[in-house]
Amino acid sequence: MKLAYWMYAGPAHIGTLRVASSFKNVHAIMHAPLGDDYFNVMRSMLERERDFTPVTTSIVDRHVLARGSQEKVVENITRKDNEESPDLIILTPTCTSSILQEDLQNFVNRASMSENSTSDVLLADVNHYRVNELQAADRTLEQIVRFYLEKEKSTLFRQGVSSVDDNNKTLTNNFLSIKTEKPSANIIGIFTLGFHNQHDCRELKRLLNNLGIEINEVIPEGGSVKNLKNLPKAWFNIIPYREVGLMSAIYLEKEFNMPYVAVSPIGIIDTAVCIREIERILNKIYFESLEGNVNTQSVLTTNPYFNSHINSTNSETRDHNVKPFDFEFYIENQTRFISQAAWFSRSIDCQNLTGKKAVVFGDATHAAGITKILAREMGIKVVCSGTYCKHDADWFREQVFGFCDQILITDDHTQVGDMIAKLEPSAIFGTQMERHIGKRLDIPCGVISAPVHIQNFPLSYRPFLGYEGTNQIADLVYNSFSLGMEDHLLEIFSGHDTKEPITKSLSTENELNWDAEALKELSNVPGFVRGKVKRNTEKYARQNAIPSITLDVLFAAKEALSA
């Protein structure tokens, strides 16, 4: 445990509460002392929603410590059950209340046995000392999905549907896995307080609709736990973000043989890779259905991208080089004519950014995606790419290998700040903390990942996924870099940007003072190198133990650097 005034990923109970509050008609009860109950305020402040946050705090106070928590927790669960009749009540401790080592599962069992209980009650199965917010969210979502699918299996078993087949798999699984008539997909991992998640969900729906694929379920955001039994009916699952949803997809693949797409469609190239992965899955399902003597052709021929030349059901006479589903025309059309990003990356405006240095830091999905866009699609030199998702470090290294000079895996914002100060990039792409660091160093920053503040929960449509997302990212990248002659024009025409240069040290210790003459001389230095001159002068002053920078010190530093 460590004391910090900034955390990229919060404690585990925040992840559980984010998942619980994303579902409809699900209530969370947090067993915690005062001070751990800030989630309601945080979500109400950031998310632009009309509904109240469905979280109640069962406060651990001195009375609870004296008498025990069981009576109070059970009473709170029963009260919320009677007042709001939610479909599910989730009980979660926090890292603080976990110290009490109470048997919360026993509390849940007691509350579930109440005669008047109409809600399911579930204890979040999360180790609060070993996992962070994102890992806990992923685990909680998988736990809820597993709970309701196992519950549906039990219901079917009691109805006499279940038995055991030759492969030692229950026929209940097969019964649950009856697919939708037309190709369909589940979108897993869209949830509250995510980075542009609602906009990304709309863009994914539009993308799938263009491919003739229906949406089966979207979870957890806006989903109902009563509909979780329908998850196996989809043909495949889409996991737009690795951080949340991957465990659920792996469970569904293992139990119901459901394939999943875990390629995040961020950027022109990865969007095409994602679509081709969907194409591969649909073609595989089609051929398997033919071998199983299931006639799906009458349904699939209505898909706009179904190849009508596939007319043989005989595997011996069928041409295996011809794909039933072929999305290449859609990819080419979107890339060349619909998305503006591919054209913009070859324009003279974007070519002006070629070779400029950038630092990228964020969650694993967004940081890896933006790194590849900058390096592959826009010709920008990524001098450092990093993530705070230390649990996914191996995947991240594999993704960004060859696209950046250095890789930084840390959840300590001071290390990130020191790296940025050392590398002196032209722009930063990161979280809210990197925006603060950029302001202190006078380096522009584009926000590409959570955690973020209110301005990155926009009312307007701003996805980061899919082809519209590529346009948004291209705008963000271009607008994050300082324009060529902007500083000079503002100075020549006495523009509004006349603030004096600020100290660019991330530490408040040993700050140097500039006298008026030195500052005046510094202001005469061209804007695009002024920051570098200032940093070199301060470095020279510190090396020589000079507390105040005068005109003589400025010139001495210049001579020392030139020598």
UniProtKB/Swiss-Prot annotation:
Record InterPro entries: ChlB/BchB/BchZ, LI-POR_suB-like_C, Nase/OxRdtase_comp1, P-CP_red_C, Protochl_reductB, Protochlorophyllide_Rdtase
Family (UniProt): Belongs to the ChlB/BchB/BchZ family.
Name of the molecule in the record: Light-independent protochlorophyllide reductase subunit B
Subcellular compartments: Plastid, Chloroplast
Main enzyme class: oxidoreductase
Binding site for [4Fe-4S] cluster: 36
Active site per the UniProt annotation: 349 (proton donor)
Subunit field text: Protochlorophyllide reductase is composed of three subunits; ChlL, ChlN and ChlB. Forms a heterotetramer of two ChlB and two ChlN subunits.
Keyword annotations from UniProtKB, A to Z: 4Fe-4S, ATP-binding, Chlorophyll biosynthesis, Chloroplast, Iron, Iron-sulfur, Metal-binding, Nucleotide-binding, Oxidoreductase, Photosynthesis, Plastid
GO molecular function: 4 iron, 4 sulfur cluster binding; ATP binding; metal ion binding; oxidoreductase activity, acting on iron-sulfur proteins as donors; oxidoreductase activity, acting on the CH-CH group of donors, iron-sulfur protein as acceptor
GO biological process, one term: photosynthesis, dark reaction
Cofactor note: Binds 1 [4Fe-4S] cluster per heterodimer. The cluster is bound at the heterodimer interface by residues from both subunits.
The protein's role, per its UniProt record: Component of the dark-operative protochlorophyllide reductase (DPOR) that uses Mg-ATP and reduced ferredoxin to reduce ring D of protochlorophyllide (Pchlide) to form chlorophyllide a (Chlide). This reaction is light-independent. The NB-protein (ChlN-ChlB) is the catalytic component of the complex.
Chemical reaction(s) catalysed: chlorophyllide a + oxidized 2[4Fe-4S]-[ferredoxin] + 2 ADP + 2 phosphate = protochlorophyllide a + reduced 2[4Fe-4S]-[ferredoxin] + 2 ATP + 2 H2O
Keyword Cytoplasm among UniProt keywords: no
Organism annotation: Chlamydomonas moewusii
HAMAP family reported in the protein's UniProt record: ChlB_BchB
Binding site for substrate: 484-485
Pathway: Porphyrin-containing compound metabolism; chlorophyll biosynthesis (light-independent)
One Pfam entry name: Oxidored_nitro
EC number: 1.3.7.7
Cofactor(s) annotated in UniProt: [4Fe-4S] cluster
